[in-house]
Amino acid sequence: LKYSFREFFLPFKRLDLSYGWRAVENSKRAHYLETIGDKTIVVSGEGDFIYFDTNNFNSDKLLQKRLPSNLKQFLEKKNFTLMGLRDLHIDDNKLYISVILQNINEKYTIGILSSEFNFQELKFNFLFDPNMDIAEYSIGTGGRIVGYDNNQLLFSIGHFSVPDKVQNKKLLPGKIISINKENKNYELLSLGHRNQQGLFYFQDNTGNQFVINSEHGPKGGDEININNLKDNKLLNFGWPVASYGINYDGSNPFKSTHKEHGYQEPLIYFTPSIGISEISVKNNDDYNTIYASSLR
């Protein structure tokens, strides 16, 4: 196989580790892209959109064009400040973004905004606005959006550095939920998660449906977790009670065995951590292959 590598610089701010990897400023420097038809769409962490012909990856210049949107004006009208994005998803000619927001009381939340997709102007409204009122900014937000069945989306919500809320079924930190795109109602699919950066939905060759996710542990204990929806159970993956990692200060308050304490064991865990990221599954005739990216 022959590969061609080219480097392109987008007209957005680049990651700056001098701020520290937990800094809000770097959250605004995380950018996301998606393809639709023969076009590639990119959104910056500050909410600016561009697009270009995907074939331009094979040339010397992307020749990107600005894609206007009402995003900043809409959030200002709703008394929110954009603190960063967590995903971009295009489905059924609609564009969805997950956003970290600060309200006028300087509390934080995560939400999903949607717009009919076109190349003239994106006009956003809230699809999902839980207004979680988290006291402090956190990078452990999850925020992955993927397509699901029956006119629904899957959405991961991280621990938000509020571990006392993760095991509470009435609160959203540490959950994976499904959201109906029409009536905006949501349903819990699992809890006890930490920071689910990878999320994927698939059916095997027998028609069974699965949700698989990858999530960051503390120091060690990165996990891949799988939920067989055939069982129709609300699975609990154990955070912050059970983990195969330890705290960064060296303390270890966690139960290392999940099952013995009533929690779901991970499909696989990694200690030391690998910096796990996105995940996907490919169906084969006899088995399914899981692909996960990482910083290792």
What are these regions (language model features)?
Residues 79-86, 106-147:
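Asp-box/WD-like beta-propeller blade repeats and closely related beta-sheet repeat scaffolds
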Residues 57-93, 131:
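Blade-loop segments of beta-propeller domains
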Residues 20-27, 76-80, 128-137, 187-192, ...:
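Surface loop/turn motifs at the tips and blade-to-blade linkers of beta-strand repeat domains
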Residues 34-38, 90-93, 147-151, 202-207, ...:
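Residue-level detector of Asp-centered blade-edge/turn motifs that repeat once per structural unit
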Residues 2-14, 42, 85, 159-296:
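Beta-propeller domain segments
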Residues 16-50, 84, 274-283:
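Beta-strand-rich domains and repeat architectures in extracellular enzymes and scaffolds
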Residues 48-52, 104-114, 165-166, 173, ...:
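Structural motif
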Residues 2-14, 22, 36-73, 116-120, ...:
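Beta-propeller domains
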